[in-house]
Amino acid sequence: MSKVLVLKSSILAGYSQSGQLSDYFVEQWREKHPADAITVRDLAANPVPVLDGELVGALRPSDAPLTPRQQDALALSDELIAELQAHDVIVIAAPMYNFNIPTQLKNYFDLVARAGVTFRYTEKGPEGLVTGKRAVILSSRGGIHKDTPTDLIAPYLKVFLGFIGITDVNFVFAEGIAYGPEVAAKAQSDAKAAIDSVVAA
């Protein structure tokens, strides 16, 4: 039995294209893998705190006493990392906002990227500690950006996920959503077909 973690990050709730694709992914996965467990974390509906000068001190190894706010941030970071490590398939709904991922998703990454916990530095360079996992990125965009300099999402996510140890990464794109109903419908249809292939693999 596999465990699937779905991370939503769109601020558009039910109107979100990436949210609809992640819901479709969950439906298809449950149909094809009924014994698997699925956890959905909505980072927009339940946002994690923004990393600031106070909170960053809680995530670095130190013997200094922590403030109550730092204690809460450290406990949440531990919870998020334990959840991430406990799942086999990580599905990230990553819509494009101004050429990059939503703030809500970046805030999550800032809480799970911890030296000595999800990665470590060695004589040969950094080593990811979140291993044996597969990631699926569902990325909706208003325009057409795939394989162009304006797509900052795919390179960033490959680097970040690889840095913490997740190197098996598949991307599903829904592009041209803002180009009109016909283009948007085709984008959704093509993305769902790609999801079907990922789920069946």
From Swiss-Prot:
MF (Gene Ontology): electron transfer activity; FMN binding; oxidoreductase activity, acting on NAD(P)H as acceptor; oxidoreductase activity, acting on NAD(P)H, quinone or similar compound as acceptor
Record's keyword annotation contains Aminoacyl-tRNA synthetase: no
Principal EC category: oxidoreductase
Gene3D superfamilies: 3.40.50.360
Catalytic activity, EC: 1.6.5.-, 1.7.1.17
One Pfam family here: Flavodoxin_2
Binding site residues for FMN: S10, S16, Q17, S18, M96, Y97, N98, F99, S140, R141, G142, G143
Source taxon at top rank: Bacteria
Keywords: Flavoprotein, FMN, NAD, Oxidoreductase
Comment on bound cofactor: Binds 1 FMN per subunit.
Chain segments annotated as transmembrane: none
Oligomer status and interactors: Homodimer.
Entry-linked PANTHER family: FMN-DEPENDENT NADH-AZOREDUCTASE 1, FMN-DEPENDENT NADH:QUINONE OXIDOREDUCTASE
Physiological role: Quinone reductase that provides resistance to thiol-specific stress caused by electrophilic quinones. Also exhibits azoreductase activity. Catalyzes the reductive cleavage of the azo bond in aromatic azo compounds to the corresponding amines.
Listed name of the protein: FMN-dependent NADH:quinone oxidoreductase
Annotated organism of origin: Citrobacter koseri (strain ATCC BAA-895 / CDC 4225-83 / SGSC4696)
Gene that encodes the chain: azoR
